[in-house]
From Swiss-Prot:
It comes from the Bacteria. This is Enolase. Its cofactor is Mg(2+). Its main location: cytoplasm. It comes from Methylorubrum extorquens (strain CM4 / NCIMB 13688) (Methylobacterium extorquens). Keywords: Cytoplasm, Glycolysis, Lyase, Magnesium, Metal-binding, Secreted. Pathway: Carbohydrate degradation; glycolysis; pyruvate from D-glyceraldehyde 3-phosphate: step 4/5. Belongs to the enolase family. One of its GO terms (cellular component) is extracellular region. Gene3D superfamilies: Enolase-like C-terminal domain, Enolase-like, N-terminal domain. It catalyses: (2R)-2-phosphoglycerate = phosphoenolpyruvate + H2O. SUPFAM superfamilies: Enolase C-terminal domain-like, Enolase N-terminal domain-like. Its EC number is 4.2.1.11.
Length: 429
């Protein structure tokens, strides 16, 4: 009844107008699953490979027809007839078929699209929402959103070197309340930027991209907006940064081209530590470059007891790199992006490894997104307690928030908002 009978794939467009892969899976009993694959702008060197056509006559070489063809030929031949309820077997069959350590032959975009669509079809067969199918009865924790309200770095055309400045409504009473708080801060910030003569254009993830000279200038605007919206920084709302430091780490130093500064590894650690002393920053993602393990260790030893240090490019949702981090006491949290590793099974394994080691996990979107809201379900299924899915603008971001609102409603009295407990360094205060 749950055998895979057909798989179709197509080239659709993501939120940046670039092609991506969408996959449909049909089961013997008529159940259907559809998934669209996201894409990143600042990508880690150790991520699974996103297969692009390289044909400059189509989409400037960014077409994904090769990945689409892989789904409808080799992958269909390999997993057609398999039981959709055996997710591990399906994913392992595709990984073995690819035969490379980073999914370079078939493409992580092809394999992931099928993996997620299979899970959705199996959930439909079971008559369950995806979060319940994947997470079982324990999946009931609604995550605290990391809301990206100021964009810089690779996500915006402005001088700010850090990529994201986020607010986390830890003092909200529910997910719906957290979304309301974030929206009110977002609109208050828009008014403050306008009043100060800044543009209110938004970046890839829906945050504003003002022409500000430094991280401190951006943080000051965010703090002002939290207060003006009627909330208390550090209590109702805490701050989070994504430095995306790999993007400006060159020749052994951190080169802030927008600010005109160069910082050594030790100076970078000092700078981040000082920011956390001056502002209620409880989470820093990619504060050091992806292969600067020594710098990461320095940062962890310096502020890891009081700040969540999230490895994105450092870990790339990969259990081998995460295991090294756990063994060496490097970072204390992992950012989870399904397309960094390329299958649902491997994604869940990374979350499980992190949680068993006492690391937190943050479910995340990519800068190139679609209306697919799978990560909202996965955040609840894994009880990870945190989700990073952009700002309160752009429907590709709001699709995830709206799905979380629906999930919270569906859970009813069982729903539990993570709140302050989501960040261990905050929960103990």
């Amino acid at each position: 009844m749950t055998a895979i009978t057909n798989i179709a794939a197509r080239e659709i467009l993501d939120s940046r107008g670039n092609p991506t892969v969408e996959v449909d899976v049909l089961l013997e009993d008529g159940s259907f699953g559809r998934a669209a694959v996201p894409s990143g702008a600042s990508t880690g060197a150790h991520e699974a490979v996103e297969l692009r056509d390289g044909d400059k006559s189509r989409y400037n070489g960014k077409g994904v027809l090769k990945a689409v063809d892989a789904v409808q030929s080799e992958i269909l031949d390999a997993i057609g007839g398999m039981d959709a309820e055996d997710q591990v077997a399906v994913d392992e069959a595709m990984i073995a078929l690819d035969g490379t350590p980073n999914k370079a032959r078939l493409g992580a975009n092809a394999i992931l699209g099928v993996s997620l669509a299979v899970a959705k079809a199996a959930a439909e067969t079971a008559g369950l929402p995806l979060y319940r199918y994947v997470g079982g009865v324990q999946g009931r924790v609604l995550p605290v959103p990391m809301m990206n309200i100021v964009n810089g770095g690779a996500h915006a055309d402005n001088p700010i070197d850090f990529q994201e400045f986020m607010v986390m409504p830890v003092g909200a009473t529910s997910l719906s309340d957290a979304v309301r708080m974030g929206a009110e801060i977002f609109h208050t910030l828009k008014s403050a930027l306008k009043k100060a003569g800044h543009n209110t254009n938004v970046g890839d993830e829906g945050g504003f991209a003002p022409n500000l000279p430094s991280a401190e200038a951006a943080l000051d605007f965010v703090m002002e907006s939290i207060n003006a919206a009627g909330f208390k920084p550090g209590s109702d709302v805490v701050l989070a940064l994504d430095c995306a430091a790999t993007e400006f780490f060159k020749d052994g130093a951190y080169r802030y081209e927008g600010e005109g500064q160069t910082r050594s590894i030790e100076q970078q650690v000092d700078y981040l530590a000082k920011l956390t002393e001056a502002y209620p920053i409880l989470s820093i993602e990619d504060g050091m470059s992806e292969d600067d393990w020594d710098g990461w260790k320095l940062l962890t030893d310096r502020i890891g007891s009081r700040v969540q240090l999230v490895g994105d490019d450092l870990f790339v949702t990969n259990v081998e790199r995460l295991a090294r981090g756990i063994e060496t006491g490097t970072a204390n949290s992992i950012l989870v992006k399904v397309n960094q590793i390329g299958s649902l099974t491997e994604t869940l394994a990374a979350v499980d490894m992190a949680q068993r080691a006492g690391y937190t996990a943050v479910m995340s979107h990519r800068s190139g997104e679609t209306e697919d809201s799978t990560i909202a379900d996965l955040a609840v299924a894994t009880n990870c307690g945190q989700i990073k899915t952009g700002s309160l603008a752009r429907s590709d971001r709001l699709a995830k928030y709206n799905q979380l609102i629906r999930i919270e409603e569906g859970l009813g009295a069982q729903a539990l908002y993570a709140g302050r407990s989501a960040i261990r360094q905050l929960a103990g205060r």
